[in-house]
């Protein structure tokens, strides 16, 4: 019989909602099968590393025969909602492991800036600083309303234009 150029189809289980910049390994192990007796195929990996037969992770080219097992690994993206793919090529066959990072949470826990009653005309007032929580990464903040409102994040400068805030920062208006 002629030698095979690819094993039986294989693939790795994808992972979603993974943390940013985290070391990830495929949950499943694939076993090479379907090769003719005595057939050995070349193996390469792109976008990450592989572990062959439970060994150390490597990116070096190797060979495989029926019964060899593989897992894949890589570091997830440092950006929100972004996929990272590692592909194992065995002969002319391929299988991929994809991780997708968590989405950015831009909706903070509810917070209230106090109202001022009986405010004097042409008088500038400042709210009590309120902590913004339950957001991830850097989030844009804007302010609007009557009387040329401004916003200040932490010890930063007052601004009427958009600015940014991160989790646990304090906001004044």
Which residues does each PLM region occupy?
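Extracellular interdomain linker/stem segments of modular secreted and single-pass surface proteins
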Residues: 2-5, 101-108
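Solvent-exposed, low-complexity, repeat-rich "mucin-like" stalks and linkers
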Residues: 6-42, 109-142
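Short beta-strand/loop motifs in extracellular/secreted proteins, especially
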Residues: 39-41, 46-48, 84, 137-141, ...
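Short, solvent-exposed loop/linker segments at beta-strand-coil boundaries, enriched for Pro/Gly
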Residues: 45-56, 145-157
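Short proline/glycine- and polar residue-rich coil/turn motifs
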Residues: 61-68, 163-167
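Edge beta-strands of extracellular beta-sandwich domains
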Residues: 93-102
């Amino acid at each position: 019989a002629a030698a095979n150029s690819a094993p039986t189809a294989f693939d790795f289980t994808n992972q979603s909602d993974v943390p940013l910049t985290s070391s990830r390994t495929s949950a499943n192990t694939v076993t090479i099968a379907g090769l003719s007796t005595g057939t050995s195929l070349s193996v390469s990996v792109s976008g990450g590393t592989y572990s062959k037969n439970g060994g150390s992770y490597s990116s070096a080219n190797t060979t495989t025969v029926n019964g060899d097992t593989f897992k894949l690994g890589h570091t997830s993206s440092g950006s929100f909602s972004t996929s990272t793919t590692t592909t194992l090529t065995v002969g002319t066959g391929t299988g991929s492991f994809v991780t997708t990072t968590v989405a950015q949470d831009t909706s903070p826990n509810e917070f209230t800036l106090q109202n001022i009653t009986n405010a004097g005309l042409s008088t500038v007032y400042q709210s009590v600083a309120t902590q913004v929580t339950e957001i991830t990464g850097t989030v844009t903040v804007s302010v609007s309303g009557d009387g040329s409102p401004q916003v200040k994040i932490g010890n930063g400068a007052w601004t009427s234009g958009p600015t940014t805030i991160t989790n646990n920062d304090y906001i004044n208006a």
